[in-house]
Amino acid sequence: MAEGSGEVVAVSATGAANGLNNGAGGTSATTCNPLSRKLHKILETRLDNDKEMLEALKALSTFFVENSLRTRRNLRGDIERKSLAINEEFVSIFKEVKEELESISEDVQAMSNCCQDMTSRLQAAKEQTQDLIVKTTKLQSESQKLEIRAQVADAFLSKFQLTSDEMSLLRGTREGPITEDFFKALGRVKQIHNDVKVLLRTNQQTAGLEIMEQMALLQETAYERLYRWAQSECRTLTQESCDVSPVLTQAMEALQDRPVLYKYTLDEFGTARRSTVVRGFIDALTRGGPGGTPRPIEMHSHDPLRYVGDMLAWLHQATASEKEHLEALLKHVTTQGVEENIQEVVGHITEGVCRPLKVRIEQVIVAEPGAVLLYKISNLLKFYHHTISGIVGNSATALLTTIEEMHLLSKKIFFNSLSLHASKLMDKVELPPPDLGPSSALNQTLMLLREVLASHDSSVVPLDARQADFVQVLSCVLDPLLQMCTVSASNLGTADMATFMVNSLYMMKTTLALFEFTDRRLEMLQFQIEAHLDTLINEQASYVLTRVGLSYIYNTVQQHKPEQGSLANMPNLDSVTLKAAMVQFDRYLSAPDNLLIPQLNFLLSATVKEQIVKQSTELVCRAYGEVYAAVMNPINEYKDPENILHRSPQQVQTLLS
């Protein structure tokens, strides 16, 4: 049947194709034939847009090995056989799947039975262990509470108890070292001791008191150990270059909480350093520095100023160094009175050198090296007293007292030396030299005074102290000098005495003018010079008036009274006498320098000489003016007075100026 159908299709297709080829004559027949329409529709189909058709044709092409009538007729059978084979293969595969699913179903059923069995058993076990679960839950709850309590206990112990390592650090051995960990443990003890006070305000007072007592005992043990160690460390600080370790500094910081132990440790430090400073001072005096540099101070004992200065300089440096050591030791101490502690210990350290220092300076002073050296030594002692007291305050009383005593001793012997020198001046007063200049004793004394004042000016003693010393030195030297000069000139004439005193006072004044704090003395000397200058001025004016013949005339004019009558009628005041005097006066006016008293040539100061000449000339002009006024006065009955005194006072003053 399949084959018959294939033939019909093939014939119909062929006929249809032939009909199409016949042209328009067969158009109407083709339109009425269904097969033709289908063929026509198939032929008009565009296969490139129908993907399903293309796929079907591709699948269909596999059935054709060759395009023959036989294969076309058997096409349907081939397709059906192919379809049957596929279905049989599908059935075979699904049979295997079915068998697997049945096996799985059996396994699932077995598992279900097992689970059911386990559920039953669990239910039975649950019913049997209900009490155990309740007990377990209760125990877990209690375990959590106990764990919390354990944590609280651990926190409490951590807060209020030390570890075994910390306990070992604090108790330690007597000779064991102190490290940074020790101070951490000690700080921990102090912190616990402070924190435990919180417990005293709760219902844990008993525990709080026990812990506080335990910490207090630990603190005392730790402080005692720290004190012993610090004492031992201080005893080792016997080298000149003292190196204070950071641990010892921390120890002093910790010991400040125990004032007694703190004080004992400072005393131990001071004792160790005192012996070191004394030994260092003796070595500096007798052995010198390392390798002989610097040389021993005793090598300069022949030079008193350097000898004393080197000793004081060494002590000044040692005092400053010891203060620095103490400041390094106590730099972390915060209690009040640290500065006082430093000064007190420095005083104790330096006290040991007082005796050897005092003995040596006394030897120098008592040997009386001379007033100038004594004064320099006195100023040196005063300077170092001021300098050292500025470093350590007034607490280093022993050393400062020793220096002050030596200062007073040197000052006393210095003024004794000046007084002795002054007394020698008065014991043997020299006569003034022929040139009326300063005596050799005066020159020597002024040279001594100049050296003393020069050393005083170059000293670094405070200003107030220097001024007070100046006043005393000047009084001790100048007053005897003035007295000596006065006694020495007492047997001279008026002009000679005035000249000698002016020269002597002038030398004193020029000496003092070079130094400070002498203003008051300079004023006193100037007043005395001016007093003697007045004498010389009067002597010079009298000398001129006498030499020109105006002295008698001037004195008579001054003493004349109206009731005595006219001057022209008085003896030696007639016109002839006056004209003769004017002749001498004219000679004086032409060469005034020829009429100078000899003493003016002995004056040391040209300025003083000019002053005397100038002021004496003014006196002469004044005297001439009075005589001129009297002669010109008609009451005195001089005839033709212009011919007697032909020069007016203004002309005379102009000529002499």
From Swiss-Prot:
Keyword Protein transport among UniProt keywords: yes
Name the domain of life this protein comes from.
Eukaryota
The answer to whether keyword Flavoprotein applies is: no
The listed locations are: Golgi apparatus membrane
The protein's matches in SMART domains, at most eight in alphabetical order, are given as: COG6
Q: How does it sit in the membrane?
A: Peripheral membrane protein
Alphabetized UniProt keyword annotations = Congenital disorder of glycosylation, Disease variant, Golgi apparatus, Intellectual disability, Membrane, Protein transport, Transport
UniProt GO cellular component terms:
Golgi membrane; Golgi transport complex; trans-Golgi network membrane
> What GO terms describe the biological role, i.e. biological process, of this protein?
glycosylation; Golgi organization; intra-Golgi vesicle-mediated transport; protein transport; retrograde transport, vesicle recycling within Golgi
Pfam families in the record, alphabetically?
COG6_C, COG6_N
Q: How does it assemble?
A: Component of the conserved oligomeric Golgi complex which is composed of eight different subunits and is required for normal Golgi morphology and localization.
Q: Which PANTHER family match?
A: COMPONENT OF OLIGOMERIC GOLGI COMPLEX 6, CONSERVED OLIGOMERIC GOLGI COMPLEX SUBUNIT 6
**Entry similarity comment:** Belongs to the COG6 family.
Described by its record, this protein's role is as follows:
Required for normal Golgi function.
**Disorder cited:** Congenital disorder of glycosylation 2L: A multisystem disorder caused by a defect in glycoprotein biosynthesis and characterized by under-glycosylated serum glycoproteins. Congenital disorders of glycosylation result in a wide variety of clinical features, such as defects in the nervous system development, psychomotor retardation, dysmorphic features, hypotonia, coagulation disorders, and immunodeficiency. The broad spectrum of features reflects the critical role of N-glycoproteins during embryonic development, differentiation, and maintenance of cell functions.
This one is known as Conserved oligomeric Golgi complex subunit 6
Q: What is the lineage of its organism?
A: Eukaryota, Metazoa, Chordata, Craniata, Vertebrata
